[in-house]
């Protein structure tokens, strides 16, 4: 079976590697088909696509869209999008608005608990000024030794209920799905195990997701346990969703799993790439 990795990030959003470097690493890891899925951003796709062509690696244009649902942030990956689609571009631009103001509020909140200079410090790690986010603040917190690693930065400062967390209203589920579908993409729920939804909440979301045009779910991803692989495989079949596989790789030393280093999908699942 070809080695698919359909979820990763570059410096166009919050990854550590430039798009071409990311593709190079994927090829070195034996990835056959790679999707670049930066947060609400498609500016890295052309560079990645060009390097993939040079290396003979099949490249899939993608994006990870931020959605607000039930008071939490949920991510939906769009695969096989057309980056030139105007409606997609406008939708992503609308979603990106407000990140800068949110970052200022995060910095002010961190300063109130004795962590000064976080906005300037976070921007040191930002390649795309439109895409400042929590991961950039996390890297600053690691650099200044407030925490030992990025995961700890999120746990202690950057998730709901912690001093550096600022909620933000992203796209609605309907608008996020419409944005992806306008660009011809396949909407796939990213890392469902990360949202801490109850069983009934997850089933409610998947029903709305499917009814709104959602088509797939990440069954195999770096943040899932073996038990969750099985749990989301069952839900994929129950809701008639295509199954996806993606590392959510952000960079060396920060990600649990490297590009392409994932278990295969179970044989009874219909993969998202089935009709490609």
Question: What feature does the model see in each segment?
Answer:
Residues 51-207, 263, 267-276:
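Extended substrate/RNA-proximal surfaces in nucleic-acid metabolism proteins
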Residues 87, 254-255:
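A short acidic, helix-capping loop that chelates divalent metal ions and anchors anionic groups
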Residues 1-72, 157-159, 171-254, 265, ...:
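An N-terminally biased module of ancient metal coordination in phosphate/nucleic-acid-related enzymes
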